Amino acid sequence: LEAPVISHLQHTNVSAISKELSQQLAANGSLSSGRVLTLVVLAEKGHSREALNAAIRASHEHPSRIIVHIAHSETDPDQLDAEIHVGGEAGASELIILRGWGSASKPTEALISGLLLPDAPIVVWWPYTAPVNPAEDPLGRIAQRRITDSQKDPLVDALYNRRNSYTDGDSDLAWARITPWRGVVASALDQPPFEPVIEAKVYGATNCPSVDLAAGWLAARLGVPVTRIAVDDPSVKKQASLNVTPVERVELIRPSGATVLEALDSQTIG
């Protein structure tokens, strides 16, 4: 891995950050023309490291410009600090980490727009707290894709709000987390016995929107009653192997009996 070029700027502004980035790219022999998108990560102090690592991993497959804004205290004096990474862990991407206090703690369009790649799609990701209506957020309005996470959003009934405010271009990681599971269930329905499913039961943690979505998806696709069962209910006997995926167990009930799919480990559903 090549040694990264990292610049630290304190008490700075967008113009100075953009100038420093241009100088780094020129010195490193890099061109932004190969970047496929700008990923804007709107994080909060204490909830940024996981999102930052995920963005860096994704950038190795999809070279991009990553802008991470970490909100600090709104009540502190105004201050904007920045780190600019070119090469190293940023791979073929450019990584800009902004830390804002006071008025700079709010990731406004004026703050972010001067750092965006020209003529490239914009993806905005709220890894923790998201607006009630992401498409109406100032940054959400300029983005082609808006990513939220109902599982981590402290907003009460975040999934309900995502549904009510859905706009084309919205994505929620609660749905993405059950993509492998949906594939397994679809495959199971193509196997004997070739009988109609008359009822289904979905098991998972109480406060898990992925499990809610899984139950709703089955009900919509199969047109049958689906019972959503909380495995953290003391009345539910838990298997030692469970609690590793959002949907821990599903029972597809047919006239001849039930087909049971269980999460065996973090990678296997059987």
For each feature predicted by the language model, list its residue ranges.
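ATP/pyrophosphate-binding catalytic subdomain of soluble kinases
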Residues: 174-231, 249
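A short acidic (Asp/Glu
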Residues: 51-52, 108-109, 134-136, 210-214
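Structural alpha-beta junctions
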Residues: 58-68, 116-123, 141-147, 219-232
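An N-terminal, globular interaction/scaffold subdomain
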Residues: 1-125
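Internal, hydrophobic cores of structured domains that mediate oligomerization or house catalytic pockets
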Residues: 94, 98-186, 198
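C-terminal structured domains
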Residues: 24-28, 215-220, 227-270
